[in-house]
Amino acid sequence: MQNSTTEFLKPRQIDVNTFSATRAKVSMQPFERGFGHTLGNALRRILLSSMNGFAPTEVAIAGVLHEYSTVDGIQEDVVDILLNIKGIVFKLHGRSQVQLVLKKSGSGVVSAGDIELPHDVEILNPGHVICHLADNGQIEMEIKVEQGRGYQSVSGRQVVRDENRQIGAIQLDASFSPISRVSFEVEPARVEQRTDLDKLVLDIETDGSIDPEEAVRSAARILIDQMSIFADLQGTPVEEVEEKAPPIDPVLLRPVDDLELTVRSANCLKAEDIYYIGDLIQRTETELLKTPNLGRKSLNEIKEVLASKGLTLGSKLEAWPPVGLEKP
């Protein structure tokens, strides 16, 4: 029993009931009330979505250019063959990918056990049927197997373009998860006089490439690793960044007199408090035409001079006028 009412109970009893190499029930108790559902749901989601596994990602079949083909002498079409290949359970030791070869001819069943394997690759369901050959049938293919996590579609998976890749290689959607099924139940538990506690029971079934008990341990490590950051949570002070005004083109800081306009045009601009080229380019044609004594001819003169410098009327300038700019 805990020493204080403020301390949380931790599970002290863990039982593993193994039904087969691929299925087991793991029960843990006691948990404080509510923790059974909290942890059970988190572990279940991690087990289903975040466990590493192996899956075929690419298949190249001799004489086949696309998945909607058929092959003489083979009972199944290519789509069915690819679906059957996805059902093969691979396990790689010490490597993250491998290229496998399958060659067979003559009447009979082609199964996963017919694939040629290096010493560090296993097929856990060698009796899994890939296709059936007729008397004159033959099949030759290469299968690429990779390590990954969760489910990855071809469009969502970044496929490395290899110039040496065999023509006609077909990309496969890949389900890497080694977990076939997982569910959990929360049952009542009791410690001394307390009867409001939880018992968590996880029912896990895998494809055989990982032990159910090891799967729970891996999921727990992932959860701990993800949550550990919150244990050391510290606010990061936000530094106040002084906004710097964008640099101003030196041409804009020059007085309008430098444009060498006619005296009439220059005087009209100064009468409207337009002293710098930066002041001028922010005015529109309509605004300038409202200026007393400044007509269309003067406006065209101003536009031509500005255009020669790569400037136009109606421009917008940020932080204008700059600090410290005075009338000339």
From Swiss-Prot:
Signal peptide: none annotated. Residues 248-328 are annotated as: Alpha C-terminal domain (alpha-CTD). Gene3D superfamilies: 5' to 3' exonuclease, C-terminal subdomain (1.10.150.20), DNA-directed RNA polymerase, insert domain (2.170.120.12), RNA polymerase, RBP11-like subunit (3.30.1360.10). It is an enzyme of class 2 (transferase). It holds the Pfam family RNA_pol_A_bac. Residues 1-234 are annotated as: Alpha N-terminal domain (alpha-NTD). GO terms for cellular component: cytoplasm; DNA-directed RNA polymerase complex. The N-terminal domain is essential for RNAP assembly and basal transcription, whereas the C-terminal domain is involved in interaction with transcriptional regulators and with upstream promoter elements. DNA-dependent RNA polymerase catalyzes the transcription of DNA into RNA using the four ribonucleoside triphosphates as substrates. Belongs to the RNA polymerase alpha chain family. This is DNA-directed RNA polymerase subunit alpha. It comes from Neisseria meningitidis serogroup B (strain ATCC BAA-335 / MC58).
